[in-house]
Amino acid sequence: MVSRSWLAALLAVGHLSSICRAQVDVPSVNNFRRRVFARGKHRPTSLSKDTQGISNECSASVIGDWVYYDGGEVSQVISGLSPQSQWRPSNPTNTTLSIDLTKSWTPEDVEIKETSKSAPKMMRQAIFTDNSSNSFYIWGGFTSYGAKIPDAKLWHFTPDGSGGGQWGTVLPHGNTAFTALTRSQGGAFVSTKDSGFYFGGFADSGSDPNPNGPVPGFLQFNYTATDTAWTNNSDSVPYSDYGTLVGATAHYAPYGPNGLIMIFGGGSHVIGTGQSVDNVGYLSFSTIYFMDPVTKVWYTQQTSGNAPGPRMWHCTVGVQGPNSTYEIFMYGGSNIANKETFDEVYILSLPGFVWQKANYTSAAPRDTQSCVVAGQRQMITFGGVNRMANNANSTLFFNEEDSFRQGVGVFDLTALAWKDAYEPTAAAYDSPDIVKAWYNEG
């Protein structure tokens, strides 16, 4: 005879198993709660007049007419149970997601396509987009809920042009150097014309078999190298006394013969094991550090205007203006020291290096979201949580229903306003009025 305690245990196991099976990567609109750490990149189909100068360095990979998102976690109502009532409040995303950018849609009715994947399920990994092959790679990140760290392999996704694609591993030239790299999470990553760059990061027990805390310097992955594709540049960098960086964004701006990689925000840690990922010294947005990706020479520029306050886990995108300006848009983020999550959009306009802030009422603070530019002048945001409103308690912030339906937001970069729908045929981008006014004033 089975005792009551054993019977209860068996029933509980069966219930948990059914909940696990019911978990999906794209919940219904009403069951969806939150999504975090989904990463990707946007690349226009071609450098036409409508898309030239668009750069997205902290979000999903737009290749052709689709934006791809990979990795992260999702929370949802399952069998009537809220996330905080389940055995864990979120679950890793098991598929690669994509959205069609040729169709009009609202966040509530947008179709999010799923593609099965053999690649590891990681959080905060880097995505490097190779424009020459219309494909992307993933590197680094951490596993959630104590899952086994995967072997050191370079995973590659080749889209099929219809929102799907194929995953596989590649053996980079100089593979010994690649496998010897410390695998970290939360670094700033960016793609240039021929390389992917990864700055800083934090090696913990979920990212590397031999975790050693904050990682200084930066990595370069040359897509076309015939000898050693991966190089570790551990020399000093100017943005931090320790050379470390976590929770920042890196942005590639098309200035000069080689372009420039710019670092925005984030925090820096003392080197060594035992450091907390939250114990950081914040980088200021009033000073911008940028590097020539070919010569590796660093430059520094002071900004003017209304600079953002210190923060981590924001996102950035950039668009070429019609009058030889280039605007970089920074959205969201959080400051653990001040216990604040932000719903703010700031604009840094080049060559003036002036900050402006979009004037709208904050309604949906979030960090760890992705953002891309699509439809010429629209920023699409994906995911994010209000971490500080819930004291960084994941059970609470995963339980909170997102005011962005399916976690998707649409922001007009010219009008500086949130929109109810995405329009692929929106008017061409023009610099916001507050940016044009600054230049007109001389």
Regions found by a protein language model. Name each.
Residues 49-70, 74-76, 115-137, 154, ...:
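Conserved short beta-strand element of beta-propeller blades
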Residues 4-21:
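Cleavable N-terminal signal peptides of Sec/SRP-targeted secreted and luminal proteins
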Residues 23-49, 58-115, 140-168, 222-225:
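Beta-propeller domains
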Residues 73-91, 139-151, 201-213, 263-282, ...:
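Short, conserved, GDST-rich strand-edge loop motifs in beta-rich repeat architectures
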